[in-house]
Regions:
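Intrinsically disordered, flexible peripheral segments
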Residues: 1-342, 349-358, 374-376, 380, ...
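ASCE P-loop NTPase motor cores of helicases and related translocases
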Residues: 267-271, 277-349, 358-512
Length: 512
């Protein structure tokens, strides 16, 4: 899972507050969050980015260096990165990569075996693959170029993307929680040698696809090296079979329970938008002083601790020679990819296809280090397949440099055919309307325009009728009268809505 949050002026101080800078990169997690930040770099012009910043991929950096880089716009090399961010501006983005809870439990209970190291390896490799993907598809900036007709704002590929990474293995509540805070600097080196801000729109557009690449890589490595099997993928995340019991997962997910409880107590459990508010309100200060061995004892003594420990003890880590051979028979075909994508959305972007491809790749299909390359190839094959149409060909970046990757949308022949069938059905006359004589008046008042509209809808001989009016014009309340008229004529009314919120309004207005 990948979540993205904008950093603020105090973000660096928070991550650095738990770091012990006397520890090297190999002094691993005796207390969570103590490991110093490490540099990460990605991009086609990696050597140029490295030389400009004065640091290398994987280098350990001090808190002062991170502070200067993000909050004072000074690179590790001492090079200026433009004006320092204001207190209310965004110095960077926190890309948080989180392993599935069952994977975190392997790490938490795997101290006495090679399991913990394999989980760490899988997580790090998965983050690396996801950053490779983001570098290719979210590594953009915007700049003005002078042309005969005037200035034009174009979207241009960066030389690379860069930042620092903090490793954490527990949640704020002290549960096993393998995750990395990958801080992406807002100011990046461009191909012309200048420094500009990252295009945040492109970053957010590619977040789900990158998160899927991360999850697919984790599944690939753990299935090959530990022999575990994963259950169904739900929203890009799959739990390990044997550790996927909902009660077990919930028992080691204290933060999730706290958030759910706060939402329920405040009557907000049906509104996903309130989850971020709940996260902030219920947030506690993270305990980084409890030694890891004490936490391990608590995890083992928990209600499901014996079950998890028994599962971990039964794993037999495999070496390179024992790992299963990859098989391309496990890779999804273009027709399957397109069918799965089109089942969820009528039009889609390249990122939508990448998201689905990563979800469909079964463990054992490829070598983990080839995940991003494989996803790219399958996406290209699906978009080039017969029956894939570009809905907005004029927005291709090959034709218009002002467009982002996400500007171009696609669909399939099957979707177009379905739309045409829908139009044919909607415009067909079926003579099933309610006659004017049978329409009974109802209590309450409608404006003349509302009454005329509902009379036309109820008495229509077409399979579909459309009511067009601005927000607040009374469309929903007017439909209450139509609902009553249909019921009086012996017809059963079923209400459908595109979103849960809209459905709630229909129920509240007694329309459905």
């Amino acid at each position: 899972m990948l979540t993205i949050a904008k950093m603020g002026a105090h973000s660096v101080a928070y991550y650095q507050s738990t770091v012990d800078e006397n520890r090297g990169p190999d002094s691993y997690y005796s207390e969570d969050g103590k490991q110093p930040a490490s540099v990460w770099l990605r991009g086609e012009k990696l050597s140029e980015v490295s030389a400009f910043l004065g640091t290398d991929n994987g280098a350990i950096v001090s808190g002062k260096t991170v502070e200067n880089w993000f909050n004072k716009a000074v690179a590790p090399s001492g090079a200026g990165l433009g004006n320092a961010p204001r207190k209310d501006s965004v110095p960077g983005f926190d890309l948080t990569f989180c392993a599935p809870k069952s994977v975190s439990l392997l790490w938490g209970m795997g101290a006495d075996s090679a399991v913990r190291g394999i989980v760490d390896e899988a997580h790090q490799a998965a983050v690396s693959q996801a950053l490779d993907y983001l570098s290719e598809h979210a590594g953009y900036t915007r700049k003005q170029v002078k042309e005969p007709a005037g200035k034009r704002l174009v979207v241009e590929k960066l030389a690379g993307i860069s930042g620092v990474k903090y490793e954490h293995r527990t949640s704020r509540a002290g549960d096993p929680h393998v995750h990395s805070h990958v801080l992406l600097a807002n100011k990046q080196l461009c191909r012309d040698g200048k420094v500009r801000t990252l295009d945040g729109v492109s970053l957010y557009h590619e977040a789900r696809a990158a998160g899927m690449v991360y999850q697919a890589t984790v599944r690939e490595i753990l299935s090959q090296k530990l022999g575990v099997e994963f259950g169904d993928v739900v929203n890009g995340c799959a739990e390990i079979v044997g550790l996927d019991d909902p009660e077990l997962i919930a028992s080691y997910s204290t933060r999730a329970r706290e958030i759910d409880q706060w939402q329920a107590e405040n009557g907000l459990e049906t509104r996903a938008a309130y989850e971020r508010i709940a996260q902030k309100i219920t947030r506690r200060t993270k305990d980084t002083d409890t030694p890891l061995d004490e936490l391990e004892t608590e995890w083992a003594r928990a209600e499901h601790g014996a079950q998890v420990r028994e599962f971990v003890a039964g794993l037999e880590p495999k070496n390179e020679a024992d790992a299963r051979e990859s098989s391309e028979d496990f890779l999804p075909k273009p027709s399957q990819i397109l069918a799965e994508v089109a089942a969820e959305r009528s039009t889609f972007t390249r990122a939508d296809v990448a998201e689905k491809v990563a979800e469909l790749i079964r463990p054992g299909a490829i070598s983990p280090e080839d995940m991003t390359v494989t996803v790219e190839g399958l996406v290209d094959a699906a978009l080039a397949a017969h029956g894939t149409w570009s809905v907005t060909p004029e927005k291709s970046r090959e034709l218009d440099s002002t467009q982002r990757e996400g500007s171009q949308k696609y669909t399939t022949v099957e979707v177009v055919d379905e739309v045409e069938r829908g139009v044919d059905m909607a415009t067909a006359r079926v003579e099933r309307g309610v006659t004017a004589e049978s329409i009974q008046p109802v209590e309450g008042e409608l404006s003349p325009a509302q009454a005329d509209a509902m009379r036309a809808v109820v008495g229509s001989d077409y399979l579909a009728s459309v009511v067009v009016a601005p927000a607040g014009a009374g469309k929903t309340s007017s439909l209450k009268s139509a609902h009553h008229a249909w019921n009086m004529a012996g017809k059963h009314v079923i209400g459908l809505a595109p979103t849960g919120k809209a459905a709630d309004v229909m129920v509240g207005e007694n329309v459905a």
